[in-house]
């Protein structure tokens, strides 16, 4: 047996909707703060520059962070050497830049 598909019958096109008068023009937007556009443009520029060099920068930061980790392990019980804090700072920077490139996207791009 075959499956018979019934096509819809041709129907009359729907009646056009009545034309409504145009809405009044919206009030002009409030002026932007002078520094806001500058900061947004600067963040956008930094983001684009970081994204362009990210493949190389990621490797360099990862190698430096790994070196700081090994240095932290070597100087673990040495008084006066703050290698743990150095590693934490490098790791935080690597994490922050990874977030900045991967998740954050400036408005207007």
From Swiss-Prot:
InterPro entries: KleE (IPR035362)
Mode of membrane association: Multi-pass membrane protein
Pro residues compositional bias, start-end: 11-21
Keywords for this protein: Cell membrane, Membrane, Plasmid, Transmembrane, Transmembrane helix
Chief location: membrane
GO CC annotations, alphabetized: plasma membrane
Region annotation (Disordered) ranges: 1-27
TM helices/strands, residue ranges: 47-67, 81-101
Keyword field contains Cell membrane: yes
Subcellular location: Cell membrane
Name the record gives this protein: Protein KleE
Organism: Escherichia coli
């Amino acid at each position: 047996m075959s499956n018979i598909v019934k096509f819809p019958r041709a129907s009359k096109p729907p009646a056009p909707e009545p034309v409504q008068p145009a809405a009044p023009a919206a009030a002009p937007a409030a002026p932007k703060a002078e520094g806001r556009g500058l900061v947004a443009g600067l963040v956008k520029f930094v983001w684009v520059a970081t994204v362009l060099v990210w493949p190389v920068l990621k490797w360099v930061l990862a190698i430096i962070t790994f070196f700081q980790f090994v240095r932290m392990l070597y100087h673990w019980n040495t008084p006066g050497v703050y290698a743990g804090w150095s590693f934490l700072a490098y790791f935080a920077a690597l994490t922050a830049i990874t977030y900045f490139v991967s998740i954050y996207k400036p408005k207007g791009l």
